[in-house]
Amino acid sequence: MKELLQKRLSEGTIIETNTYYGGGRDTTERHRQTLQVNGWADFTTVDITDAEGTAMLPVPNGKWFTEMSVGKNMLQYDSLLTLTHFKGHTMGGFGGSNKNLGIGCADGKIGKKMIHAGETGSQWGINNEEFMERMTESTQATVSHFKDKIAFINVMRNMSVDCDCAGTSAKPVVTPDIGIVASLDILAADQACVDCVYALPEESKHDLVERMESRHSMRQLTYMKEMGMGNDRYQLIDMDNGDKVITAAEAVKGVKGTWVSDGN
């Protein structure tokens, strides 16, 4: 990341929002302290976009929302490169570009509450398919705002079952590193990653697939398609091998995880 930002994206800015839950990033002051401790402030500019307020973006064709609350400063930028660590997620089942944008661009106090709680009165009152749809509608607000000036990169490496936003240590990673998926189509990017996970041997994918299916996470993909956000039919191009078109099964051929049976 440091090399990328300094040599290739030296004029770029990382954007963040404060978190909905407590911890080291729930207020702007603590968030900036966390960025400093982790070294980000030493080599790049980080804009906590909801530090100075929020803005509402329209949600085209939304079922749950007509608009979504985002960090106000995000509207200052004319393009967005979405860099995502693809992995499991406590509520989303998996976290790809859709989760990164849907939760990550919604501001910490209003937008994230709209997704997670709605009118339930409970901080985490929304789950399963409804959560996937609300999160996807939030993503739609950001994707529609940037139009054709947005791209998506999913890094399929160190794919833990839980996201680091859970605030607890995840189980040991057993899913092997696969590679990096990039696209101008958010649905194609996330669909390709999911297809690669499913193409893994059972012992390597078991925990991650169980997490995805138990959370109804495929609704992320089907709802993106219903909302016209992208195409789930794609070509997987292997840039390391002469731009050859490959299948998900070919992409994961020969990779091995470190899964060890617990005897049960």
Question: At which residue positions do the language-model features occur?
Answer:
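Extended, low-polarity segments enriched in aliphatic/aromatic residues
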Residues: E3-N264
